[in-house]
UniProtKB/Swiss-Prot annotation:
Similarity comment: family membership: Belongs to the UvrC family.
Gene: uvrC
Organism for this UniProt entry: Lactobacillus johnsonii (strain CNCM I-12250 / La1 / NCC 533)
Assembly and oligomerization: Interacts with UvrB in an incision complex.
GO cellular component: cytoplasm; excinuclease repair complex
Superkingdom assignment: Bacteria
Keywords associated with the record: Cytoplasm, DNA damage, DNA excision, DNA repair, Excision nuclease, SOS response
Name assigned to this protein: UvrABC system protein C
């Protein structure tokens, strides 16, 4: 529901093209969009029911701004600028760069070949990126041996080591003609562009000769070199008739998700591909999200623009081309059209795969939780809360609460309780008293703060715990939450549930679950998790209390001094190991530090 402030602004929206900036309660821009008609588009966010990611966005909007322009093309260019400026949360968020290295031929008087992960526009020739870093390093070493350029810092007045090894042309002590560099660079570029037939033939002959000469280590080195060349230079089969560097983008949309597939063609070969999947914020215009993605994609660090970008029909190619500064085309027939369709098919395949994996995951989460509710005869609920207690012969009693939402642990909602002990139940080991106390504290607070109650409470225990929990909920708090107990067998293994409501005259009954069902597995996960959480909390509490008790026995050490030591050292062992000076650094006086040292 829109606020009065937003409703008033909606009435003033113009029927013009432009961009809109959605803002949260802190005034931060959380989404940037564009439209041919700002009035219709912005109003649609607040005047119709939203689902998915768009619903999440609308819930956070507290204000918006608009910027009008004279054409849809201008709104597209402005949108890209605003997204780059504000990096809004609900716009497509791209990861920074691939991190893969390039082989660079530097643009210098005395050029060199090197591996780099940073691309400087117009600073040289770049080849890659190469996903196999080790193969790229080996290929670079091969280039430096076969077609050397400069390998040293240059101009040092004497030949460098690499010159003596034949891996440097000698810029270190003489002027190397530019024509010599140019000839070497042409050979390197041909090699990195895929002209490797002669190189492979020469290496194969050398490998064969080394084997015949029983130089097996040398033969193995050459074999590995051939493999690295194939991984970096010859990696893919030829799939096109021309050698234009081009990137191919296509997409597929389903269930408010978009899958984008990118093919990188270099020297008529498919060098690599990338897939991006993300939920759509504006499901009405997936084309806008697609085009915005492409524009942001090349704004990333180390992204090298190709000579041509191919996109499917229906895109604003002219505006996108203006942003990218390279031709953006839509092929109508032939190999390019086939590659575009292949990118679409791969995008669909990836999104279908994601949904299948989500479905399998749901069987173990939502599906498993539904099995538990069905077994208890309850309508499906999203939230389960579970309690367990821990103590050592009544000492340092604690309780722990874990929360599972739609079958998954929601650790941000976990809670820990140090039990104080009821008046009528002074024995801290008493399960009834512990259960009553923690249930009362938990749900009286939820009532006071008007927070949502769980759909089911699972007690780690049997009839005693369930009846104590129900007594507090029904008779003290007047809360009607279903409660079941997770019962273990004689071997301390999860066995079944116990369910009913004696406060309403219902008998507690054993509810079996199929041990091979997902619902049974979820029940054991909940029981194991709440037990783990309670035990871990108790160990820490007991250790801390034991340390405090030990320090309390030392004459002259009061609560303030004790807390200083606990903050500084954290454990009795570290306090014992500390010197008098270190104890004084914690804030103790010299007599106190000496007393602690002697007492421990």
């Amino acid at each position: 529901m829109a606020t009065e402030h937003i409703e008033n602004k909606l009435k003033l929206l113009p029927d013009k093209p432009g961009c809109y900036l959605m803002k949260d309660v802190n005034g931060n821009v959380i989404y940037v969009g564009k439209s041919k008609n700002l009035k219709n588009r912005v109003r649609s966010y607040f005047k119709s029911k939203q689902v998915g990611r768009r619903a999440e966005l609308v819930r956070e909007i507290r204000d918006f701004d608009i910027i009008t322009v004279s054409s849809d093309k201008e709104s597209f260019l402005l949108e890209i600028t605003l997204i780059k400026k504000y990096q809004p949360y609900y716009n497509v968020q791209l990861k920074q760069g691939t991190g893969y290295p390039y082989i660079e031929i530097t643009n210098e008087r005395d050029p060199q070949t090197r591996l780099t992960s940073i691309v400087h526009k117009d600073h040289g020739y770049y080849f890659g990126p190469y996903p196999n870093v080790y193969a790229a390093q080996a290929t670079l070493k091969f280039i430096q041996k076969v077609w050397p350029l400069r390998r040293c810092t240059g101009h040092q007045g004497r030949p460098c080591l690499y010159y003596h090894m034949g891996q440097c042309l000698g810029a270190c002590f003489k002027e190397v003609p530019k024509s010599t560099y140019d000839a070497q660079i042409r050979k390197i570029k041909r090699f990195l562009n895929g002209d490797i037939a002669q190189v492979k033939q020469d290496l194969t002959e050398k490998m064969t000769q080394a084997s015949m000469d029983l130089e097996f280590e040398r033969a193995a080195e050459i074999r590995d070199q051939l493999k690295y060349i194939e991984q970096t230079v010859e990696k893919q089969k030829i799939i096109s008739n021309d050698h234009t560097q081009r990137d191919i983008f296509n997409f597929y949309v389903d269930k408010s998700w978009i899958s984008i597939q990118i093919f990188f063609l270099r020297q008529a070969k498919l060098l690599r591909r990338e897939t991006r999947l993300f939920p759509l914020t504006d499901t009405n215009d997936p084309q806008d999200a697609f085009v915005s993605f492409i524009a942001q994609f090349y704004g990333q660090r180390n992204r090298v623009l190709p000579k041509e970008v191919l996109v499917p029909a229906g895109m604003d190619n002219e505006s996108l081309s203006e942003v990218l500064k390279v031709p953006v085309r839509t092929p109508q027939r032939g190999q390019k059209k086939a590659l575009l369709e292949m990118a679409h098919d791969n995008a669909k395949l990836k999104l279908d795969e994601k949904f299948r994996l989500l479905e399998l995951g749901n069987r173990k989460t939502k599906g498993a939780q539904k099995e538990i509710f069905d077994a208890l005869g309850l309508p499906y609920g999203h939230r389960i809360e579970s309690f367990d207690h821990s103590h050592i012969q009544g000492a340092d009693p604690v309780s722990a609460l874990v929360v599972f939402t739609d079958g998954e642990a929601d650790k941000h909602e976990y809670r820990k309780y140090k039990l104080k002990g009821e008046v009528e139940h002074q024995n801290a080991a008493d399960e009834v008293g512990n259960t009553r106390e923690v249930v009362r504290r938990r749900y009286s607070r939820l009532l006071k703060e008007h927070k949502k109650m769980p759909d089911l409470i699972l007690m780690d225990g049997g009839q005693i715990q369930v009846e104590a929990c129900l007594d507090v909920l029904r008779n003290e708090l007047n809360v009607n939450i279903p409660v079941a107990g997770m019962v273990k067998d004689d071997h301390h293994r999860t066995n079944h549930l116990i369910f009913g409501d004696p406060t309403k005259g219902e008998e507690l009954k054993l509810i079996p679950l199929d041990p091979k069902s997902e619902g049974f597995y979820l029940m054991t996960r909940i029981q194991d998790e709440v037990h783990r959480f309670a035990i871990t909390f108790h160990r820490r509490t007991h250790a801390k209390n034991a340390l405090s008790s030990k320090l309390d026995e030392i004459k002259g050490i009061g609560p303030k001094s004790r807390n200083k030591l606990l903050r500084k050292f954290g454990s009795l062992k570290k306090i014992k190991e500390a010197s008098v000076d270190e104890l004084r650094e914690a804030g103790l006086t010299l007599p106190q530090a000496q007393t602690v040292k002697l007492s421990l």
